[in-house]
Amino acid sequence: MTILIDADGCPVVDLTLQIAKRFVAPVIILCDTAHQIEREGAQTLVFDKGADSVDFALVNRVKPGDVVVTQDYGLASMCLAKCARVLNQNGLEYTADNIDALMLRRYENKKLLRAGKHPKGSPKRTKEQDVRFTDTLEKILNCNH
């Protein structure tokens, strides 16, 4: 079981590495040339900047039982299809039960953007989000050990 991080814009890279170290779980950080992220204790793979280049590289590497950290619903859906466990930076685990609704929300938001309506941005990251992320990742890793 490997933890793969879609690291472009991911606020929990270091937190993931701390947790992975306790579980002796290997970590692969995937990013594009605009976000080169090197961390001790992880393998970093860097890809050309471009639409979905990191996403497709991650999907090509993920295996059943792996854990993926991403905030991208489309990538999450593809990883679920490959029998990976997937969570976002706030500790929400994507599942077959919630991914369709999340994909629909993404579609609706894109329609609003095309119509010139911009949804509010994300609020500042909180300690509670880190706690939820930690709890969810530890729960997943405990199931896989």
Where would I find each of the regions flagged by the language model?
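Nuclease catalytic cores that cleave nucleic-acid phosphodiester bonds
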Residues: T2-H145
